[in-house]
A protein has these predicted regions:
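N-terminal small-domain helix-loop-helix segment of the aminotransferase-like
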Residues: 3, 10-103, 110
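Residue-level signal for alpha-helix termini/capping positions
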Residues: 29, 63, 87, 116, ...
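Short beta-strands and strand-loop turn motifs
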Residues: 35-39, 145-147, 172-177
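Short acidic capping loops at alpha-helix termini that bridge into adjacent secondary structure
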Residues: 93-98, 118-121, 168
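Conserved PLP-anchoring active-site segment centered on the Schiff-base-forming lysine
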Residues: 114-136
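Short beta->alpha connector loops at strand-helix junctions that form conserved
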Residues: 126, 145-151
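A short helix-loop-beta submotif of the ANL/AMP-binding
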Residues: 137-144
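Active-site phosphate-binding strand-loop segment of PLP-dependent enzymes
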Residues: 150-205
């Protein structure tokens, strides 16, 4: 049976976490025993169970038949709780400012699909979580990495961001705490990145 050819767009997308899956499956077929470090899935390991209060809440929701489609923007109680949490961090956030997604991966797809055009650039920290590289490619954009200083605990190199700014940059991505380095950016560093972005009207952080 002939395979269906992938589109040029799909063929050009890089996704490091998944790129190793097919070769790994081949090695397993050959009898090799692999330790899979390509993806973080702590709940799949013994000793890290789902918290009991979450299991109980899920059971109760099923028993109430409260398991249909939710509101488009997310459950209102959840959005209000998120808004209140953000208010403790100094943001005058309201529930109308909150859009609930199934994790950061879906959030990235929504953001990039909504705002990126052909030829746009996303500045993202390097190293980074693979979707920051893969998803802009889906929409005709590209990702350029800005440096993290390993000698300073993987701190954001704001000078490198300045060097890489131009009119094509639509997003500067700040991952805080950073995945995979674990670095937590100082408030002064985030303010500096915001200051850089203000000089470029097309750019959002």
């Amino acid at each position: 049976m002939n395979g269906i050819p992938a589109s040029r767009r799909a063929s050009s997308i890089e996704y490091a976490i998944r790129d190793v899956v097919v070769p790994a499956m081949e090695l397993e077929r050959e009898g090799h025993d692999l330790i899979k470090l390509n993806i973080g899935d702590p709940l799949s390991y013994p000793g890290l169970p789902t918290p009991s209060h979450m299991v109980d809440a899920f059971k109760e929701a099923l028993e109430r038949q409260d398991n249909g489609y939710g509101p488009s923007y997310g459950i209102e109680d959840l959005r209000e709780a998120i808004a209140k949490d953000e208010q403790t961090k100094g943001w005058d956030c309201r529930s109308d400012d909150v859009y609930v997604t199934h994790g950061v991966t879906e959030a990235l797809q929504v953001l990039f699909a909504a705002f990126l055009e052909q030829g746009d650039t996303v500045l993202a920290p390097g190293p980074h979580y693979p979707p920051y590289m893969a998803y802009p490619q889906m929409y005709g954009a590209k990702t350029v990495e800005y440096a993290l200083d390993s000698d300073q605990g993987w701190a954001i190199d704001t000078d490198d961001i300045r060097r890489k700014m131009n009119d094509s940059v639509k997003f500067i991505v700040i991952v805080n705490p950073n995945n995979p380095t674990g670095n937590v950016a100082k408030p002064s560093t985030i303010k500096e990145v915001l200051s850089i972005a203000r000089d470029w009207p097309n750019c959002t952080v």
